[in-house]
């Protein structure tokens, strides 16, 4: 397999600009013929014109005359082109129904959709397919009117008509220049839900959501989420929508969550369709977040885009930050923040410590699809949040305004964003640039001592070596701190001339001591408040210190983190006891703290549910070597069993309290969702303590399962039960919702994530289910993806879990390398496993690597893991 690596250092501005792009799609069966007419302007006359493409090439013309060209692989080179502005006409033929990669133009059912980010446009036609080539697009679509009554593309519809042969045509014009990755086309038989939004300047924007006719009743929440996002972006950022129409199309076959194509967003149905019968509270929250995210891209991604794909976090990190803020402003800011932190630590921290570690702005890649990562998105969002922490809301907004003033309509870099933040606030952020160029999660080691009424906090920072870089420079790290006395009260202190109960300490050196003055009593420091930087922070807290922070700290993150640390210590003690073959510890202090949390009626319910959540196995073994996953699983399960049995009466009582507070008729709202979240926590502990309770659940299932959140909670709680009753409940669930694709995704996820002893057998059976298709990414992620995260089965001692996933990677890679590359990253833990499992994984990876025709998507990941 040939290996082509692209490097950030090799960036050159494009030799040619494409001022105007006129596209003509003639959709027939089975082929679609695409004609493009490009108005090209040389930037460096004399260089050849190089176009990217993989479609069947029919013809190439320059200024109307047939052109001489060389086609090698996916590169079309025209050596002899005019030195002044000229036109290029390219005609290609594509077969959408045969395109199983879901990139470019592809069929989903009887309809056609596109996905062009990052390099899908080249599957449609030949083009300078890079984000810094921005062009004004006009698109004409011709198709059979009966089969494809709806024809959509970017921008505003400016013309249309019918032919005598039963075909019709529509012409779309996008007045804003955009790169090719933002092009979109949809053709099919779709129903539309319409609404309107009046912008802050009084413009009346038409909103259209396209779905199947059957799904039309499920789009209401997504429509309202869009209107809320449009209003929020005006209020918080002063950003107004710029076209006459905003369209969203939902498709069931989609590699990603959604795509922000200018004026024509294409969404995975998972993030559009919802009602109480089929969607959980988490689904509703996900829809609001993703709808917001894609809308916010209109400014942070579309109006200002990336110069090159190495700068992907410029748009994605910033827009994730914006959608997190949107969700936080909508409901439960503290809980949303902790959920984001947990996502980061469960998924991005291991990525930063593994074989695929890369900076927020990568320096090289073989396959760009592999860099749509947690690092680029979630760590990128934390980098943006640090700007906000350092500058405050006012300073951050000043930076945003300058960013748009300088760069609206341009393709720019992460450094341009940093410069806008620095210049708008008169601050030097040169050192901050290391967050973009250094991979790895910084580790802070902190110590504190009280001396002469000064609490001296000493912090040392190290950035661990990663495959791309051994030696790292000290980072600029904001550490937000507070102090509590032994009664749990906030203690004021003086720092840099200000007296307060909280301050942001700015680390810029490998080791610094920060004097917090005017402290006259013993204190416990509350460190990294709000998770002010994406780092590990270690401080020699005693258990009593952590119990005090858990009971009294006003900062939600440090309170939750105290609980997480106590749980981690308890699991570590269980792990040691299991290894030594002795009895498990009693954990009396932890249990007393948990009892207080359960009994605290003043706690927010969603926050209480978070405090009662034990870290996952992946969080528990993070930062360790020679990992035996089953030992961690056993130690964690033992702690959960202890909590379940010890507080069984309290779980029953708390469940009854929550049931009383819920509305009888389900309607999603953050307040009622919090109660349902707590109920599901209680149910899980009850069914863990009393597995036989499953029979009562089965008898009263229809009464208990009033909405999908309840059904999800109940089935999750019984999913590991070895009885036939569990199988019957799951089968009933599948029968009940057999015609709902998204709920069937939930069913397949239950099968793949079960801890039952026969799970692998049940997964293999589910592969033959009439509603399962490996070619559908949602289905593959639900069944195969969930199994790859199933600790006891994926990491089975005999290697059967590894073999199963490897076989599926090979199978999926033949038609959808992007999904296969995501799945193969389940093996990223390879080199940290104990020797037996490490060898098993390496055997499977070598088998994958030996496959003829292996994609560069999968090959790049496998190569990095094997080293």
Model-derived regions, located:
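N-terminal, polar/Ser/Thr-rich
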Residues: 1-33, 58, 102, 106-115, ...
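Long, ordered, helix-rich scaffold segments
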Residues: 373-374, 517-867
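Hydrophobic alpha-helical and helix-loop surface patches within well-folded domains
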Residues: 172, 201-459
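Short acidic/polar inter-strand loop motif in beta-rich domains
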Residues: 93-101, 464-465, 531-537
């Amino acid at each position: 397999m040939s290996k082509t690596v692209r490097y950030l250092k090799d960036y050159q501005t494009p030799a040619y600009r494409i001022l105007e792009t006129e596209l003509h799609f003639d959709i027939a069966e089975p082929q679609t013929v695409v004609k493009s007419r490009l108005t090209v302007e040389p930037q460096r006359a004399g260089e050849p014109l190089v176009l990217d493409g993989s479609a069947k090439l029919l013809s190439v013309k320059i200024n109307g005359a047939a052109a001489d060209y060389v086609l090698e692989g996916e590169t079309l080179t025209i050596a002899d082109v005019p030195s002044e502005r000229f036109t290029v006409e390219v005609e290609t033929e594509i077969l959408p129904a045969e395109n199983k990669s879901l990139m470019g133009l592809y069929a989903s059912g009887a309809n056609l959709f596109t996905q062009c980010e990052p390099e899908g446009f080249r599957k449609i036609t030949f083009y300078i397919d890079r984000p810094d080539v921005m062009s004004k697009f006009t698109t004409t679509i011709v198709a059979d009117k009966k089969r494809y009554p709806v024809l959509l593309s970017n921008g505003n519809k400016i013309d249309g008509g019918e032919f005598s042969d039963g075909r019709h045509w529509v012409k779309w014009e996008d007045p804003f220049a955009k790169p090719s990755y933002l092009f979109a086309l949809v053709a099919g038989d779709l129903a539309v839900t319409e609404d309107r939004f009046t912008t802050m300047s009084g413009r009346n924007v038409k909103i259209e959501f396209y779905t199947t006719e059957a799904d039309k009743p499920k789009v209401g929440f997504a429509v309202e989420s869009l209107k809320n996002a449009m209003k929020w972006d005006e209020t918080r950022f002063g950003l107004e929508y710029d076209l006459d129409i905003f369209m969203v199309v939902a498709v069931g076959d989609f590699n990603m969550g959604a795509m922000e194509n200018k004026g024509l967003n294409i969404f995975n149905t998972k993030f559009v369709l919802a009602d109480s019968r089929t969607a959980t509270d988490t689904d509703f929250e996900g829809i609001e977040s993703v709808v917001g995210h894609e809308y916010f891209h209109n400014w942070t991604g579309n109006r200002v885009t990336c110069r090159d794909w190495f700068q992907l976090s410029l748009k994605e990190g910033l827009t994730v930050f914006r959608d997190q803020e949107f969700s936080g402003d909508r409901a439960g800011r503290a809980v949303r923040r902790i959920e984001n932190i947990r996502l980061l630590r469960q998924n991005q921290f291991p990525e930063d410590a593994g074989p695929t570690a890369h900076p927020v702005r990568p320096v090289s890649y073989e396959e760009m699809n592999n860099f749509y990562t947690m690092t680029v998105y979630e760590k990128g969002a934390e980098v943006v949040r640090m700007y906000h922490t350092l500058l405050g809301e006012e300073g951050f907004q000043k930076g945003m305004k300058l960013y748009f003033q300088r760069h609206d309509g341009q393709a720019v870099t992460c450094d341009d964003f940093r410069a806008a933040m620095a210049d708008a606030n008169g601050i030097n952020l040169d050192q901050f640039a290391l967050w973009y160029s250094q991979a790895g999660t910084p580790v802070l080691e902190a110590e504190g001592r009280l001396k002469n009424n000064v609490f001296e906090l000493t912090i040392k920072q190290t950035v661990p070596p990663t495959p791309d870089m051994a030696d790292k420079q000290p980072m600029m790290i904001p550490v937000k701190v507070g102090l509590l006395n032994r009664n749990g009260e906030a203690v004021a202190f003086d720092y840099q001339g200000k007296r307060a109960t909280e301050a942001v300490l700015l680390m810029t050196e490998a080791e610094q001591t920060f004097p917090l003055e005017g402290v006259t009593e013993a204190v416990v420091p509350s460190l990294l408040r709000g998770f002010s930087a994406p780092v590990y922070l270690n401080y020699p807290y005693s258990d009593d210190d952590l119990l005090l922070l858990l009971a009294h700290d006003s900062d939600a993150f440090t309170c939750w983190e105290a609980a997480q640390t106590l749980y981690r210590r308890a699991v570590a003690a269980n792990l040691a006891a299991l290894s030594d073959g002795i009895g498990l510890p009693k954990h009396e202090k932890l249990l007393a703290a948990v009892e207080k949390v359960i009994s605290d009626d003043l706690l927010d319910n969603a926050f209480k549910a978070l405090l009662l959540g034990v870290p996952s196995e992946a969080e528990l073994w993070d930062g360790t070597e020679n990992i035996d996953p089953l030992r961690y699983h056993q130690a964690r399960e033992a702690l959960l069993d202890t909590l379940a049995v010890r507080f069984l009466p309290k779980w029953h009582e708390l469940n009854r309290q929550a049931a009383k507070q819920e509305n009888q008729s389900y309607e999603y709202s953050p307040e009622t969702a919090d109660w349902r979240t707590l109920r599901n926590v209680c149910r899980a502990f009850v069914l863990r303590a009393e597995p036989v309770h499953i029979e009562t659940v089965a008898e009263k299932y229809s009464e208990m399962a009033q909405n999908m959140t309840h059904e999800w909670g109940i089935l999750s709680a019984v999913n590991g039960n070895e009885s036939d009753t569990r199988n019957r409940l799951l089968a009933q669930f599948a029968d009940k919702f057999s015609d709902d694709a998204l709920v069937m995704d939930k069913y397949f996820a239950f099968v793949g994530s079960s801890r039952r002893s026969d799970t692998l057998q049940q997964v293999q059976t589910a592969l033959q289910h009439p509603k399962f298709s490996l070619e559908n990414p949602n289905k593959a992620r639900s069944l195969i993806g969930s199994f790859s995260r199933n600790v006891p089965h994926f990491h089975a001692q005999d290697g059967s879990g590894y073999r199963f996933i490897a076989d599926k990677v090979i199978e999926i890679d033949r038609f959808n390398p992007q999904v296969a590359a995501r799945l193969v990253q389940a093996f990223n833990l390879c080199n940290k496993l104990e020797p037996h499992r490490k060898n098993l994984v390496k055997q499977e990876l070598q088998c994958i690597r030996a496959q003829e025709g292996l994609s560069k998507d999968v090959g790049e990941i496998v190569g990095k893991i094997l080293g």
